[in-house]
Amino acid sequence: MKENPFITRSKILEENKDYLDESVKIISRIFIEVIKNNGKLIFAGNGGSAAEAQHMSAEYVGTLVTANKRNPIPSIALSTDTSFITAWSNDHGYEDIFRRQLQALANKKDCFIAYSTSGESNNIINAIDYANSKGIKTISLTGSKNSEASKK
């Protein structure tokens, strides 16, 4: 008999509860620090992860819950500028599309949030390396805690 996907996911969440609880606390502290210091939340991802990054950025800027009246929080998703992405990729390759945008947009008050299901995407890893080298806070949201992006 095939197991219910909800039950499977619930088991995974329960097995990782302590790890997730601590991770959520750390991420919350980082976001609070960035917001208090007038920094930006900068999101990136590829494919479905790009969609997640764009959605999260929209939530911070626009508060998509109409009952929630608050000021917008500076946020951007690096996957939205198709003119830059296609031009840079055509001339220089896809591996540095996010790193290049971080060079132009990010500073030490900001946080770079990288979404990657595999955690092995070169453009994500290169952006994390750049952010770390410049003292920009980084958060990696991946499908594997053993991935290259998670180790950074």
Residue ranges with predicted function:
Residues 33-105:
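Glycine-rich, small/polar surface segments that engage phosphate groups of diverse ligands
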Residues 128-134:
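Surface-exposed amphipathic alpha-helices with a cationic face
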Residues 140-152:
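Short, glycine/polar-rich helix-capping loops at beta-to-alpha or helix-loop-helix junctions
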Residues 49-54, 120-127:
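Short glycine/serine/threonine-rich phosphate/pyrophosphate-binding segments
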Residues 79, 116, 142:
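Short beta-strand/turn micro-motifs composed of small residues
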Residues 19-37:
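A short, well-structured juxtamembrane/interface segment
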Residues 1-19:
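Generic N-terminal amphipathic, Lys/Arg-enriched alpha-helix
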